[in-house]
UniProtKB/Swiss-Prot annotation:
Gene3D superfamilies listed in its UniProt record: Aldolase class I
Upper lineage: Bacteria, Thermotogati, Deinococcota, Deinococci, Thermales
Segments forming a coiled coil: none
Keyword flag Cytoplasm: yes
Protein name: Probable transaldolase
Superkingdom of this protein's organism: Bacteria
Chief location of this protein within or outside the cell: cytoplasm
Any GO BP annotation: carbohydrate metabolic process
Length: 223
């Protein structure tokens, strides 16, 4: 399973990319707005394009960039503009009627599409049939309403395997490291997570205790 970072912060991307384990990045309008607010920079079309280009050059893998339009025609136009920024851009569309229409057209043009805001296996099936390269079920948000995000992911992964659909599953809305383990065990192709969760994957108190003990023992006997 590949690991993606769900952020638009170049600083966070550079930090995790240095670990050598980062395969891609997912963004959305909220994350982009936060990144520009943190920089104190105006969010112009030119600045946005330059920012996305910098992300693509840093990570070297797929970077999902989401449209803000709601109608298919406008989604297609915006998707084309996003795809033109860098070859690694994947156009992110909402799983709606208009999103499906736009997905069909963009994918027919050779533009990769990530269908997002998926909360059912049927939505994932529709997205795959519309030509999506990726589908993104939201584990955390499903858990939030007392449903089972893991069960949703299991259904989608199994359905795609049974139907032999050429689409990758991105486990999204990851809230904690257990979600990552669950996604890997259930067969997700990718898990995308916030910077804080990515950092937590590495943390374990016994690792810190063990390292401290090794160093203390070495100090006692070193020449």
């Amino acid at each position: 399973m590949e690991l993606y970072l769900d952020t638009a912060s170049l600083e966070e991307i550079r930090e995790i990319a240095a670990w050598g384990v980062l395969s891609g990045v997912t963004t959305n309008p909220t994350l982009v707005a936060k990144a520009f607010a943190a920089k104190g920079e105006a969010l112009t079309e030119e600045a946005f394009a330059a920012h996305l280009r910098a992300i693509c050059e840093t990570v070297g893998g797929p970077v999902s960039a989401e449209v803000t339009a709601l109608e298919a025609e406008a989604m297609v136009a915006e998707g084309r503009r996003l795809a033109a920024i860098h070859p690694n851009i994947v156009v992110k569309l909402p799983t709606t009627e208009e999103g499906l229409k736009a997905c069909k057209r963009l994918s027919a043009e050779g533009i990769k599409v990530n269908m997002t805001l998926i909360f059912s296996a049927n939505q994932a099936l529709l997205a795959a049939r519309a030509g999506a390269s990726y589908v993104s079920p939201f584990l955390g948000r499903v858990d939030d309403i007392s449903w089972d995000g893991g069960e949703l992911l299991r259904e989608i992964v199994e359905m795609i395997q049974v139907q032999d659909l050429p689409v990758k599953v991105i486990a999204a809305s990851i809230r904690h490291p257990r979600h990552v383990t669950e996604a890997a065990l259930l067969g997700a192709d990718i898990a995308t997570m916030p910077h804080a969760v990515f950092k937590q994957l590495l943390k374990h108190p016994l690792t810190d205790i063990g390292l401290k003990r090794f160093l203390e023992d070495w100090e006692k006997v070193k020449p």
